[in-house]
């Protein structure tokens, strides 16, 4: 309830230095007619030159305007919820307003600032004029309870009332040493105030934490010796950040700070059609920047949308760019549920585009805003409308609504995947179900590691599981392969199915499948189809080879693969990877190159498979990676310098480089063939 932005206090330096000009000159062309004729004195009407009259705001005016604009945004977006106070400091601290609701308004603050006025240049240069008086008063103001805190105290609940706040000090310091002294004084006074808040004095509330923001203001074009510094924790009670900014840019800086202080976002409504003042028959497009809660964008954006952001000239913060949508008739298909509404306030409330947009909305009209999708199209994501004299931005639901029915898993996300193996996944979950046992089962740890190692999520990502839709005996055959307790009769039945596949391959029958993994395949040859099928079948049997019957099936399949010519090099290994591999695919079993007859190929395959089965449980991931690196290194010759140099010594790179005798010998050997060629030609 009581957050850090509940209390914000502006401390404005009212010393003599703030009476100087900001050096940002504004041209004032008050004559619409022709420029006055130069009489030779170099001045025209009113003492102005041909360029017109120019004036510059003082540092005090820049500080007052930007700070009042800060509190206007706060009071527009959080009416009656967030409090802002002003303290003017010169020889003493002058309180502009209090935490009372009657003084938390723009008219009271502006009237008080008019009474304070610009600092006089004839003000004496004395140490009595200091911003420290205002900082002391700001700490005392933080200890004063607001109306909400007083209501909590009056309720009689014995709870600790959080009391945090933020102090924004607009001053001008000479160097970093002066800034360090301000921090130390502020921290000391803060500790003293908390001591007074405790018993027996009990003067005000204890300050749990304070955020001090110091804005060091300098005229335009003047270099400052004070360096910028991000948020720094000075003590458990105090965080300090320092910003050095020129006077004309202080409004942009405070707008940037208010975004973080109150979790706001900036949105620029672009391409607003507006009639020109000079020519009512033509119109131009204008942009209006508005501020609102950051949640207006976060709750509306989904994964298919990206916020278009940009940085305005002179600003340091990003603004979201939304395009004005031309009003059109909305049918039932265009109606969208609203996810939330948030108050809106313009950044430049006095500009003509802002006033036109505000009047347009206050007259009962609504504005739809568009944002782009990642695919390139656009969607209506927000709407501006007014109710009760206040303007709101509505976040529209541009993704799947919570009121829509959830899609079935068979439809897939967005209807892109439709062949999920939901039934098989349910069976796998039932088979992998674990229950607590009183005694340890030695076979229990191996079961969850073995079963989910290869499970294609869709039928289209596997040839083997894709065929069970078209071959009647294939589902029962796959069920027998993954059984943990296969008997001899089931082994014979599986052997028959494997031989049946071999007979079909010998006849050249095409397998009854069309496509896999959503791609159009070019497997016109039956040999390519059966090669991929055999390799995936071997992987599945190898993963479930826990009994003697499984191992017999594996040996039989490998013998058939060798007889069918699978022991040769595989040109379509990339096809196999695209078909059979999934995130849970096992390591591929590469065949051994053949060097003789089919019988020797079968024996070598059987020996290799037995060697793999005996060592698969003992090899670690490091062993697998090391063996792969060694096999890759053995394919190419090592560096000759490493081979010829004894161990422990450094090989010399290009040892014959620069050896003149060696070069002369090489030149002689190259010249001899040339002489011989000339003698032959002659």
UniProtKB/Swiss-Prot annotation:
Pfam families: Mat89Bb (PF10221). InterPro entries: Cell_cycle_regulator_Mat89Bb. Phosphorylated. One of its GO terms (biological process) is flagellated sperm motility. The keyword RNA-binding does not apply. A motif (Nuclear localization signal (NLS)) lies at residues 606-612. Transmembrane segments: none annotated. The keyword Transcription regulation does not apply. Residues 571-612 are annotated as: Disordered. GO terms for cellular component: cytoplasm; integrator complex; nucleus; perinuclear region of cytoplasm. Residues 517-570 form a coiled coil. It is found in: Nucleus; Cytoplasm; Cytoplasm, Perinuclear region. Keywords: Cell cycle, Cell division, Coiled coil, Cytoplasm, Developmental protein, Differentiation, Meiosis, Mitosis, Nucleus, Phosphoprotein, Spermatogenesis. Residues 571-583 have a biased composition (Polar residues). Belongs to the Integrator subunit 13 family. Component of the integrator complex, a multiprotein complex that terminates RNA polymerase II (Pol II) transcription in the promoter-proximal region of genes. The integrator complex provides a quality checkpoint during transcription elongation by driving premature transcription termination of transcripts that are unfavorably configured for transcriptional elongation: the complex terminates transcription by (1) catalyzing dephosphorylation of the C-terminal domain (CTD) of Pol II subunit Polr2A/Rbp1 and Spt5, and (2) degrading the exiting nascent RNA transcript via endonuclease activity. PANTHER family: INTEGRATOR COMPLEX SUBUNIT 13, SARCOMA ANTIGEN NY-SAR-95-RELATED. Belongs to the multiprotein complex Integrator, at least composed of IntS1, IntS2, IntS3, IntS4, omd/IntS5, IntS6, defl/IntS7, IntS8, IntS9, IntS10, IntS11, IntS12, asun/IntS13, IntS14 and IntS15. The core complex associates with protein phosphatase 2A subunits mts/PP2A and Pp2A-29B, to form the Integrator-PP2A (INTAC) complex. This is Protein asunder. It comes from Drosophila ananassae. The lineage of its organism: Eukaryota, Metazoa, Ecdysozoa, Arthropoda, Hexapoda. The gene is asun.
């Amino acid at each position: 309830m009581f957050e850090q932005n509940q209390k914000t206090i502006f401390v404005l330096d009212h010393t003599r230095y703030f009476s100087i000009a900001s050096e940002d000159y504004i041209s004032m062309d008050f004559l619409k007619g022709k420029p006055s004729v130069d009489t030779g004195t170099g001045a025209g009407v009113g003492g102005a030159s041909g360029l017109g009259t120019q004036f510059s705001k003082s540092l005090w005016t820049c500080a007052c305007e930007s700070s009042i604009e800060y509190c206007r945004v706060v009071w527009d977006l959080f009416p009656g919820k967030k409090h802002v106070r002003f303290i003017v400091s010169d020889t003493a601290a002058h309180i502009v307003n209090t935490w009372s609701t009657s003084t938390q308004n723009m008219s009271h603050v502006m009237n008080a600032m008019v009474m304070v006025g610009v600092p006089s240049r004839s003000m004496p240069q004395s140490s009595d004029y200091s911003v420290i008086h205002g900082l002391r008063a700001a700490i005392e103001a933080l200890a004063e309870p607001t109306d909400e805190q007083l209501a909590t105290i009056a309720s009689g609940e014995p709870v600790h009332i959080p009391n945090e706040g933020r102090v924004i000090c607009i001053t001008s310091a000479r160097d970093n040493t002066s800034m360090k002294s301000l921090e130390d004084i502020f921290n000391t006074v803060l500790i003293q105030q908390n001591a007074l808040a405790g018993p027996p004095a009990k003067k005000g509330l204890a300050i749990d934490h304070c955020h001090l923001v110091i804005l060091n203001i300098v005229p335009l074009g003047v270099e400052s010796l004070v360096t910028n510094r991000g948020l720094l924790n000075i003590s458990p009670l105090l965080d300090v950040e320092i910003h050095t900014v020129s006077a004309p840019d202080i409004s942009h800086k405070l707008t940037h700070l208010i975004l973080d202080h109150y979790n706001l976002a900036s949105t620029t409504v672009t391409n607003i059609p507006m009639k020109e003042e000079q020519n009512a028959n033509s119109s131009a497009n204008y942009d209006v920047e508005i501020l609102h809660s950051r949640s207006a964008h976060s709750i509306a954006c989904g994964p298919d949308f990206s916020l278009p952001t940009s940085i305005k000239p002179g600003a340091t913060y990003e603004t979201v760019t939304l395009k004005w949508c031309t009003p059109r008739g909305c049918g039932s298909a265009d109606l969208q549920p609203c996810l939330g509404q948030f108050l809106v306030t313009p950044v430049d409330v006095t500009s003509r585009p802002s006033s036109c947009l505000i009047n347009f909305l206050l007259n009962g009209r609504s504005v739809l805003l568009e944002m782009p999708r990642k695919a390139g199209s656009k969607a209506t994501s927000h709407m501006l409308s007014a109710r009760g004299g206040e303007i709101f931005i509505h976040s529209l639901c541009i993704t799947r609504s919570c009121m829509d029915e959830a899609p079935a898993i068979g439809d897939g996300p967005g209807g892109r995947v439709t062949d999920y193996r939901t039934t098989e996944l349910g069976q796998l979950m039932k088979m992998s179900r674990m229950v607590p046992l009183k005694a340890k089962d030695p076979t229990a740890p191996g079961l969850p590691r073995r079963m989910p190692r290869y499970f294609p999520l869709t039928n289209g990502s596997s040839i083997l599981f894709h065929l069970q839709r078209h071959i009647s005996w294939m589902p029962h055959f796959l069920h027998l392969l993954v059984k943990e307790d296969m008997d001899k009769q089931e082994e014979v039945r599986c052997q028959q199915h494997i031989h049946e596949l071999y007979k079909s391959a010998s006849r050249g029958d095409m397998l009854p499948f069309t496509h896999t993994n959503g791609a159009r395949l070019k497997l016109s040859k039956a040999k390519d189809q059966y090669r991929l099928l055999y390799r995936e079948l071997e992987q599945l049997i190898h993963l479930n080879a826990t009994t003697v019957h499984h191992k017999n099936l594996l040996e039989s399949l490998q013998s058939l693969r060798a007889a069918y010519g699978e022991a040769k090099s595989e040109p379509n290994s990339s096809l196999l990877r695209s078909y059979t591999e999934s995130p849970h695919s096992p390591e591929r079993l590469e065949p051994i190159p053949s060097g003789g007859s089919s019988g020797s190929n079968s024996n070598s395959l059987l020996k290799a498979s037995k060697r793999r089965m005996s060592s698969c449980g003992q090899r670690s991931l490091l062993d697998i990676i090391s063996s792969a690196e060694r096999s890759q290194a053995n394919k190419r010759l090592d560096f000759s310098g490493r081979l010829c140099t004894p161990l422990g010594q450094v090989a010399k790179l290009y040892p014959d480089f620069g050896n003149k005798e060696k070069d002369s010998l090489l030149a002689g050997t190259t010249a001899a063939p040339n002489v011989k060629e000339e003698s032959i030609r002659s």
